[in-house]
């Protein structure tokens, strides 16, 4: 195949010999020490992304026959949560990487699956996302894909919110055919080298949270897409959603990963607050106690935080097992399978969003005024959750659950459901 990014990376270990959750936990411990400083600085988490590359976790979902870990979805979800607990931006980046790679299997050919999975595993490739545009609505795709005589395309335009594009090796991109050919108006998906001439990831990401996700824009100027880099036929990705085919599993999987990024951040906030309350918080004098850990209202708050997380964690793990069950059905997937999964994931997304927002803001009540000093960085937890939880309105996820419960309706397959 023609798809072969110029840079290669030596795979440092046999992934099958390690516990991926333990590997992630070890990395998280290292990153936790610099998380506040890096959040304040923004920019790119270059060193930390190289840590992930060296760990071989980038091939977590790559089947073992292609050299990867061959991990199941419940394990992958746990890894995302461990990483996000230490650093929301890194959890975000790794989560997007995990949503990108299965696109190969969901809509690509067997040859593409074998080639790309093998390359990801052997060279520890990062995958980047270039699907969204800053237009009137999510289906208003304007990056043009002009067909070429050899069956490929030429891309022109700008994508936005390209999480992980900068520093990636493989870029997943969508374009719309805008010529007078029979393909006019069709959306094509492709996996191309990020280093391809004409691809420019820009340093223009600016938000209150997720500051090290490189989620800025990416320009495409006369970018050649080779025929064997095109994933599926024109409109294959769109039709998969309309017909509830296996390719439409991309969305419930992505939504579940997002939910677990939030839960990881909530765990990180709770852990950091607990340590502060135990070691630095002062008791409230009128309470007549000797230590802040004896305050009945503080104790109640920690109880409420923990209970909220227990419920959301349990729901998330149950949904991860359902993802695996549905994934294993392959082409035998039914619209009912897909609908039940999306309804379940919608509930998890709501639980995780609310729990993470409440905990990341509520911890300030148990650490006290001194804990608001920037050196502690407690605000980063809320900023990270608040920023990404606006990806798609959680109110619509709640409505999806309500429609399913009351009227037996499944969420309508789409790019956010």
UniProtKB/Swiss-Prot annotation:
Catalyzes the first step of the '4S' desulfurization pathway that removes covalently bound sulfur from dibenzothiophene (DBT) without breaking carbon-carbon bonds. Sulfur dioxygenase which converts DBT to DBT-sulfone (DBTO2 or DBT 5,5-dioxide) in a stepwise manner. This is Dibenzothiophene monooxygenase. Reduced flavin is provided by flavin reductase DszD. Pfam families: Acyl-CoA_dh_2, Acyl-CoA_dh_M, Acyl-CoA_dh_N. Residues 19-125 are annotated as: Helical N-terminus. Pathway: Sulfur metabolism; dibenzothiophene degradation. Homotetramer. It is found in: Cytoplasm. Expression in B.subtilis confers the ability to remove sulfur from polycyclic aromatic sulfur compounds found in gasoline and diesel (biodesulfurization), which are a considerable source of pollution. Modification of the operon so the start codon of dszB no longer overlaps with the stop codon of dszA leads to increased expression of DszB (in R.erythropolis) and about 5-fold higher levels of desulfurization of DBT. Rearrangement of the operon into the order dszB-dszC-dszA leads to 12-fold higher levels of DBT desulfurization. GO terms for cellular component: cytoplasm. FMN binds at residues 96, 129-134, 159-163, 282, 369-370, 391. It comes from Rhodococcus erythropolis. Transmembrane segments: none annotated. Residues 235-409 are annotated as: Helical C-terminus. SUPFAM superfamilies: Acyl-CoA dehydrogenase C-terminal domain-like (SSF47203), Acyl-CoA dehydrogenase NM domain-like (SSF56645). The lineage of its organism: Bacteria, Bacillati, Actinomycetota, Actinomycetes, Mycobacteriales. Residues 126-234 are annotated as: Central beta-barrel N-terminus. It catalyses: dibenzothiophene + 2 FMNH2 + 2 O2 = dibenzothiophene 5,5-dioxide + 2 FMN + 2 H2O + 2 H(+); dibenzothiophene + FMNH2 + O2 = dibenzothiophene 5-oxide + FMN + H2O + H(+); dibenzothiophene 5-oxide + FMNH2 + O2 = dibenzothiophene 5,5-dioxide + FMN + H2O + H(+). Has 3 domains, the helical N-terminus (residues 19-125), a beta-barrel central domain (126-234) and a helical C-terminus (235-409). The C-terminus (410-417) forms part of the substrate-binding pocket with the C-terminal helical domain. The lid loop assumes one of 2 conformations allowing opening and closing of the active site.
